[in-house]
Amino acid sequence: INRPEVRNAFRPKTTSELYDAFYDASEDSSIGVVLLTGEGPSPKDGGHAFCSGGDQKARGHQGYVGEDGRHRLNILEVQRLIRFMPKAVIAVVNGWAVGGGHSLHVVCDLTLASEEHAIFKQTDADVTSFDGGYGSAYLAKMVGQKKAREIFFLGRNYSAKEAEEMGMVNAVIPHAELEDTAYEWAQEILGKSPTSIRMLKFAMNLTDDGMVGQQIFAGEATRLAYMTEEAKEGRNAFLEKRKPNFGDDQWIS
């Protein structure tokens, strides 16, 4: 996210660009892991930010106003794409993660945080906003109901260490080593089975994502089934207008 002068706050143009980048990464078979971070430090004051949420200067009557004058909440589309893409997404929190920016890190698969600069804060109740989906409900699964309500109701600042102790950060890293560590984690994941990573991500999502999660997991299972000789026989028999012969396939107990 490249708006360091406003703590990497997002407006509709930002979220559209984020969506396009994530979509391209999702579709590109040469990509297995995505790192999400914020540009910095700020040219104004040297401050670091991952993302400070929606740019309140772009906020209109029904959402955030784009260059075309339309009101949008398209950051939710970005959240869903991160959640549903078949690849690991790592939030590299190099500074403030606030409001909608906090929700972005929550929806990512893993979070690495700068020891010196990462600060976690939910400001929804300060600006009359509320992330009623992954940003709050999924957060409660991570840190527990009471702690999640504290985070949202009080809007306090939490250090990287405090966030790690709550369970919403995987590791706290010295700032100078944060980017290199993120690449190391990505390389470790890239050394694993792509099919396993995909299926494990969707399996872990399944219990929280209802019928949508079930559909995604089932779709991936169907993809695996298509690769079997049994499936090829079914397809070929249909195309050749004959009865399929599954004689060599066994009913596995």
State each model region's role:
Residues 6, 38-81, 97, 126-128:
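Glycine- (often His-adjacent) and acidic-residue-rich active-site loop
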Residues 1-41:
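Conserved CoA-thioester-binding segment of acyl-CoA-metabolizing enzymes
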Residues 4, 45, 113-118, 130, ...:
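C-terminal long alpha-helix characteristic of the crotonase
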Residues 78-84, 92, 98-152, 166, ...:
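CoA-thioester-processing core
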Residues 110, 150, 154-156, 162, ...:
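Well-ordered beta-strand positions
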Residues 53, 72, 76, 99, ...:
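Glycine-rich phosphate-binding loop at the start of an alpha helix
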